[in-house]
A protein has these predicted regions:
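Short, structured secondary-structure boundary patches
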Residues: 52-60, 216-228
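A short helix-to-beta-strand connector/capping loop
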Residues: 87-91, 116, 225
Length: 228
């Protein structure tokens, strides 16, 4: 068994902190883990958040708080080098969960082109620069059908970009229980076909979220998609 979505953000870049995850994985009989950081944690990715920051006061405050604890990627890589020099009973991969903004795909490519990380997870947390998964009340008065359509369009673009190994929590749009009044089978099918064509994996992620809808899962399996 493997867990490729473990965030480090509550601790420091030390071997001792990472070894806590190793010990926990051993207890759970997990043979492989991937230690991740969100892209907003690094200055190199901050240009991708420019329009999102400017979207409203809440998002400006959210981003400015993240800046206070931001680091440079080289720090994470030095931490990764230290881990790769060790020999653990649990295999450790290193990765990034990258917020996908289609207008900044070039920045993402430039920052990650050195191939240092084992896994790059692409995630859609923002619909045209609006963060849909942080506050339920911000959904009020919005066109749920339009948001769902746009969400899947953005995921299609993330898959087509060729930037990522895994599409992270691809059903996150359901986080607050709002659902469209139309059938999503075609959206599921189109996305799964693109994921399959790119050789990507689709993430099964139920942490603080709804996980994949059964219909989404069925379509993914029918398309021959592989999961992480």
């Amino acid at each position: 068994m493997r867990d490729w979505h473990i965030h480090l953000e509550r601790g420091s870049y030390t071997v001792e902190w990472a070894e806590q995850f190793v010990r926990r994985a051993e207890k759970l009989e997990i043979s492989e883990i991937c230690l991740l950081e969100h892209s907003v944690r690094f200055f190199e990715f901050h240009p991708t958040f420019a329009q999102a920051r400017a979207y409203n006061d809440y998002q400006q405050h959210w981003f400015d708080e993240k800046v206070q604890t931001a680091r440079h990627l080289d720090e994470f890589k030095r931490f990764g080098d230290a881990l790769r020099a060790k020999n653990y009973p649990v295999k450790i991969k290193l990765g990034l969960e990258i917020c996908f903004f289609p207008q900044h795909a070039d920045v993402i490519e430039q920052v990650t082109r050195d191939g240092y990380f084992d896994l790059l997870l692409g995630s859609v947390h923002w619909i045209d620069n609006w963060t849909f998964n942080q506050r339920k009340n911000q959904w009020q008065g919005r066109d749920v059908n339009a948001l769902y359509r746009r969400y899947f369009e953005l995921q299609n673009q993330a898959a087509d970009s060729g930037l990522f190994d895994i599409l992270a929590h691809p059903d996150l749009i359901r986080c607050f229980g709002f659902t469209p009044d139309f059938d999503l089978t075609e959206q599921y099918k189109t996305l799964c076909q693109k994921v399959k064509a790119q050789g990507m994996l689709l993430e099964m992620n139920g942490a603080k979220g709804p996980g994949l809808h059964p219909d989404f899962l069925a379509v993914a399996k029918a398309c021959g998609v592989q999961f992480s």
